[in-house]
Regions:
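N-terminal, polar/charged subdomain of small-to-medium soluble alpha/beta proteins
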Residues: 2-149
């Protein structure tokens, strides 16, 4: 396989500096679109403290998936796109599982669900506990994963 054609792209320069550039690969990239599930709130058994094991807490989950547009387009066919319903059902099942200690663990599981469809190239998961600190709307994490080429 031959190396991709590379052309230099000039960078912004500071006053008095010499121009610099670096090669940028010129490769064809598939057309993509985004699927977003925003602010899905579910009760979960989550937390590291003993008092958190006896009750459920509200957790807000948001997911963004960058999806490869199929060759020839979608054609208004549900079989040519990832299932939104499958994602929501997977999140509900995740919320009903046994106690989880960390929101980071939940975010990893959310990414596993999102990346399960082969058309998904990249996924972002945001997981927030809503009722932890009285002076904050939430505390949370944001994880991102890309499919390896």
């Amino acid at each position: 396989m031959s190396a991709p054609n590379r052309s230099p792209i000039p960078l912004v320069m500071r006053a008095g500096s010499k121009p610099t550039s670096f090669p940028v690969a010129e490769t064809a990239r598939a057309a993509t679109y985004l699927i977003r599930l925003r602010h899905f709130v579910v009760p979960m058994s989550i937390g590291v403290y003993a008092h958190e094991e006896d009750r459920h807490q509200r957790v807000r989950i948001s997911v963004e998936m960058e999806v490869e547009l199929p060759a020839g387009g979608i054609g208004d066919e549900i079989g040519r796109v990832p299932s939104y319903e499958g994602l929501v059902e997977g999140l509900q099942a995740l919320a009903e599982k046994e106690h989880v200690r960390l929101i980071e663990t939940v975010a990893e599981h959310v990414l596993d669900l999102a990346m399960a469809h082969p058309m998904v190239l990249r996924a972002v998961a945001e997981v927030e506990k809503l009722d932890v600190f009285p002076d904050a709307e939430s505390i949370g994490v944001r994880f991102e994963r890309r499919r390896e080429d």
